[in-house]
Structures are given as C-alpha cells and as structure tokens.
C-alpha cells in the first residue's frame, strides 16, 4: 500500500484521493501537520526535499505535485486508460486542462484567498478579477461539454472539481457561470470519492469562519 502524506483540507491532496478511489488504489494516509513543521523534519525532507504535500511513496518511489501523482496512479493502476487516454490528442487536451487548473484557476484562488486566510491581509480587488477571468475561461472550455476534456470523466475533471469545490466553500458564486455550474453539479454525482472531497472542503472552510 502506498503511503500518502496529506492534509484533508488541501485541494491538491483531495484530487489525488479522488483519483486513487477512481482506480481502486487504497492509500495509507499520513496526516502532516504543516503548522507544527512536520514537513521540515529531516525524515520527510529525505522523501521530498521540496517539503510539499501531497507526497506519495509507492514501494519506495516518491512523487509529489498532485497532477503528476494523479497521472502516475492512472498509468500504473488504472484497469483502462479512460481517465488519461493514450490517444495523443485526447491526452493533450487533458494536459492543457491540468496545466490551466494549476497555473491559472487554482493559482487565482491562492493569490486572492491565501493572503486573507493565512496573513489576515485585506482582499485585493485585482486578484479577484483574475478569479473571474479564470472562471470565464473555464466556462468557455465547457460550452456544450459534459466533461472538462473529452466525452467522459478524466483526471482533468477530478483536478478541476477539487479546485472548484474549494472556491465554493470560500464563498465564490459559481452559479454565475452556467456551463461551470452545470458541469460541477454533474461532477459531484459521477466523481469517485466526492464525499471525502467535500468533507475536506468543509475542513478548509473553517479558515473562512
């Protein structure tokens, strides 16, 4: 069983948990207390010198960065390639969505909400505009689409649903974006591990209360 270092409130950690559920892999979950500095202990730095979560250790093989872990789990343990198809064009679209999630959508969340939550900084209206812009892009990607990349559930949907659900508990109005809202309501029903994802979201929500 693979060791999985995580926090339940973390969106990237939740995307890995849902992917593992989708491919039927059980994770040996190890909570890492970042506030206590557990990620900076020598034993963890040996595993991941970048000292980030999520981190997976599968039979001695250590990997971090959630989207890399998602792809690894599907390629190693998936009974089919449906979550990350081998077709170069299908895979390219999935990769684009994953990079969009990492570099644009979730980054906009971090830039706007993290300073407020962790540094008690005032809200930055310019950073909020970046969130709105990211959702407008996602809304366009999802025009006429039931799924984020192709005609079935993929790791792109799983990564994006982890992010979008985090926006929801932060109080962002997803319903303003009709295509995103429709996709999200469906994703809640069809994504394996959604319940655990939502429980983690509610943990994260405590930072906003």
UniProtKB/Swiss-Prot annotation:
Residue span(s) of domain GST N-terminal: 1-81
Pfam annotation, one family: GST_N
Superkingdom to which the source organism belongs: Eukaryota
Reaction it catalyzes: RX + glutathione = an S-substituted glutathione + a halide anion + H(+); 1,1,1-trichloro-2,2-bis(4-chlorophenyl)ethane = 1,1-dichloro-2,2-bis(4-chlorophenyl)ethylene + chloride + H(+)
Catalytic activity, EC: 2.5.1.18, 4.5.1.1
Family: Belongs to the GST superfamily. Theta family.
Function, in words: Conjugation of reduced glutathione to a wide number of exogenous and endogenous hydrophobic electrophiles. Has DDT dehydrochlorinase activity.
Protein name: Glutathione S-transferase 1-1
Species of provenance: Drosophila sechellia (Fruit fly)
Lineage: Eukaryota, Metazoa, Ecdysozoa, Arthropoda, Hexapoda
The gene coding this protein: GstD1
């Amino acid at each position: 069983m693979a060791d999985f270092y995580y926090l339940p409130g973390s969106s990237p950690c939740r995307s890995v948990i849902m992917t593992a559920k989708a491919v039927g892999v059980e994770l040996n979950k190890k909570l890492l207390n970042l506030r206590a500095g557990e990620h900076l202990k020598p034993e963890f730095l040996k595993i991941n010198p970048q000292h980030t979560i999520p981190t997976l250790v599968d039979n001695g093989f250590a990997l971090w960065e959630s989207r890399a872990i998602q792809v690894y789990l599907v390629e190693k343990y998936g009974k089919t390639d449906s979550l990350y198809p081998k077709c170069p064009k299908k895979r390219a679209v999935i990769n684009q969505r994953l990079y969009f999630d990492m570099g644009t959508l979730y980054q906009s969340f971090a830039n706007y909400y993290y300073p407020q939550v962790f540094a008690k900084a005032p809200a930055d209206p310019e950073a909020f505009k970046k969130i709105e812009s990211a959702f407008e892009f996602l809304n366009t990607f999802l025009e006429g689409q039931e799924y984020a990349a192709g005609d079935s559930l993929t790791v792109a949907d799983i990564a994006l649903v982890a992010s979008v659900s985090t926006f929801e508990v932060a109080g962002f109005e997803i319903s303003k974006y009709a295509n995103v809202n429709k996709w999200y309501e469906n994703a809640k029903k069809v994504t394996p591990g959604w319940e655990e994802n939502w429980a983690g979201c509610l943990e994260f929500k405590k930072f906003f209360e």
